[in-house]
């Protein structure tokens, strides 16, 4: 029975008759879809580009083993209709960034709810909802931490009002089959440690994923591959740990299986390599027969500086380190007795040697630049697992905030943070007053404008298009023209129209210090004015930098005025917190679902938000604090 029967009549009618959009059918999306139909929502559009992976099954409860390889959106719809057949659900197996889903598409809905796992899609939906003037409920989880917030044009901050740290997210099949970044190999190496020496986890399998949907063009082929994988695993295979034990943890046999045989198997999945550079297997004997090489960083014409942990070695050295670490870990495991397990610790030298060597060997196989032990240690310590109960709590809060919006009580909406532990006031859920729009936001301001520092003699039009306009400012199909009185077109969204400009330097078009560019994305109904600040003093490997990010521009007086404006008429007397950085242990920023994206996730125990805490019993003065994101937390990862 739908809960709408207990709602006020007008709200119940809005719930039953209104059309809502859910973007994402993963960890949060499954819980949210279930909550919506049980609350009485009857007209739901659901969109997700992803397909179901085995690793999803432990928490994305609308999916079963038989669904592996199929569309998440379609299967979620089918599963929900089994227990609520009256619902009218439209499922799209597609990207929300497809131009078909334009402003008019978004205007069909009374409410949009995000259950996404990557920054680019979040930015895009944020802009589409602003353009369509449709309320958006944004959400995210990372481990035990979660967050829900409401975004409404002209009333609240938008998703991009304040810069966020780099998000890193990625699916399990990327880890096992098609790594493209060093962090993918580092995660794989940590999984391998647990498979060999620690507690085995089916979600941390390291062998090639034969059920990878990308390796099959048709869903039926993916399902057949999954069945073959399961049958083969049940009959012919034993666990990785049992196999390793049967070899006596022989380093050469382990090396051959992981870096030669498994890679050769990946190469048989030829569809994976049609648009990727294929991996190159390593042979133990060939590696050992190599002469002593210089360090990898020397090969890349970089000076060999710093401590030993900051040096990048050659393949032969990492192969030897791999062998030595296995021997040491085997002894440690034997000393603990039968049935014992080792726990990976980045401060354990042997465990760190193992992950460093295994990760670097895999990087070499997949044609990536290898990393130092120091870099790998910093990245390997920031991996966050997905937790089903966190997704469930956040999905419930999304619906509650949605009911407030449909009741016409958006002033009662809050940003709500879910904490790992109760705060000093014994609360796990901490509500915060919504902030008003940032007047300097380059997305939702009345006249979005930003300044970019770069070297006009070095930066190409292609860099401007891909790294600045698309990646940094999240445009999908930009048109860029120079404000030179002529309207010179620099970049066109029409394919091939300005391709000849790609490798030309900006200076070749008369762009210099003080030049202004107008970037338009007609899909997002978004225009951004870019001021060019020429500089020849950028740091090494820095192509550009955005000058004066929006949060840094907001002065104390502006912040105080904004705080007053949002508390006027509030029944609970919500006021900005006077808490110091050390006291705000209960307020956290979360920006990933449960996985890519990604990552990457944007959260840690040490991160704090600019939001204001609510406390019904205390009269707090209007003073805001902001905790700077710690640089070393940029690679916190949420895994799917």
UniProtKB/Swiss-Prot annotation:
List of catalytic residues: 173 (glycyl thioester intermediate)
E.C. number(s) listed in UniProt: 2.3.2.-
PTM-bearing positions, type Phosphoserine: 207, 507, 592
Acidic residues compositional bias, start-end: 583-597, 631-640
Result of altering residue 173 to A: Loss of enzyme activity
InterPro entries xrefs: ThiF/MoeB/HesA (IPR045886), ThiF_NAD_FAD-bd (IPR000594), UAE_UbL_dom (IPR028077), Ub-E1_IAD_1 (IPR042449), Ub_act_enz_dom_a_sf (IPR023318), Uba2 (IPR030661), UBA2_C (IPR032426), Ubiquitin-activating_enz (IPR035985)
Cross-link named Glycyl lysine isopeptide (Lys-Gly) (interchain with G-Cter in SUMO1), sites: 164, 236, 420
Residue(s) carrying N6-acetyllysine: 271, 613
UniProt KW keywords: Acetylation, ATP-binding, Cytoplasm, Disease variant, Ectodermal dysplasia, Isopeptide bond, Metal-binding, Nucleotide-binding, Nucleus, Phosphoprotein, Transferase, Ubl conjugation, Ubl conjugation pathway, Zinc
GO biological process: one example: protein sumoylation
Effect annotated for changing residue 117 to A: Abolishes ATP-dependent activation of SUMO proteins
Cross-link Glycyl lysine isopeptide (Lys-Gly) (interchain with G-Cter in SUMO) mapped to chain: 190, 257, 271, 275, 611, 613, 617, 623
Pathway in which this enzyme or protein is active: Protein modification; protein sumoylation
Cross-link (Glycyl lysine isopeptide (Lys-Gly) (interchain with G-Cter in SUMO2)): 236, 257, 371, 420, 540
Biased segments, Basic and acidic residues type: 222-231, 551-563, 606-630
Stretches for region Disordered: 202-231, 551-640
Impact reported for residue 59 to A: Strongly reduces ATP-dependent activation of SUMO proteins
Chain positions recorded as Zn(2+) binding sites: 158, 161, 441, 444
Record-linked Pfam families: ThiF, UAE_UbL, UBA2_C
The protein's assembly and partners: Heterodimer of SAE1 and UBA2/SAE2. The heterodimer corresponds to the two domains that are encoded on a single polypeptide chain in ubiquitin-activating enzyme E1. Interacts with UBE2I.
Physiological role: The heterodimer acts as an E1 ligase for SUMO1, SUMO2, SUMO3, and probably SUMO4. It mediates ATP-dependent activation of SUMO proteins followed by formation of a thioester bond between a SUMO protein and a conserved active site cysteine residue on UBA2/SAE2.
Name of this protein: SUMO-activating enzyme subunit 2
